[in-house]
Amino acid sequence: MAAERNRNRYYFFVFLTLGATMGIFLSADLFTTFIFFEIMSFTSFVLVMHDEEDFTVRSAKTYLAVAVIGGLVTLMGLFMMYQKAGTLNMAELTAFMQSRENPAEFYAIGVLILFGFAAKAGLFPLHIWLPNAYTVAPAPSSALLSCLLTKTGVFGTIIVSCKLFLHDAAWGQFILILGIITMVLGAVLAVFSVNLKRTLACSSMSQIGFIIIAIGMQGLLGEHN
């Protein structure tokens, strides 16, 4: 980054992104997690559009649009969950969901909450931002986004799957299907890519699919875990 312009802005937003990431992993309730997710959406947007070229800005705006829409859908799901459970504390939500005889009535709410996390993780069909964003961002930003941004989305998926729908076979099957499609699609896109950074981006998307498959398996295995 020594020869790059806007270095001070870059490092400032890198620290903000790292701080938001720490907030996500240290949060004890879903609403606090959501707040830090949205902070990360805007700080990582600046990292993607660092070069300020036309295609760079368009790619960054695509990412921001997906992130904002995903965040709004997740917020709707959080409101609905709070109305049902009266809390968004993760430990209390786990106890609440385990006390329900029919968790299927919460599937729609779970999908809404998952939507924003899936957008961050780059899951199909919300992956449209990922290849271009990784390609146009500076190499240090691409590395940061690859190791942090998508993994926070995976962390959100783990929260929904293991806190709300632990050992739920139907939910696990749904997550498993998303993981398989993401894994295969990412690999296919990587094979046909002619840009090295885009190839690595699509490969990262495929690897996310592998992780999501593992999350889905905990539901399918059920009480055998």
Question: Language-model features: where?
Answer:
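Hydrophobic transmembrane alpha-helices and their helix-loop junctions in integral membrane proteins
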Residues: 1-8, 18-33, 43-225
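Alpha-helical transmembrane segments of multi-pass membrane proteins
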Residues: 12-15
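Short phosphate-coordinating micro-motif centered on Lys-Gly-acidic
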Residues: 38
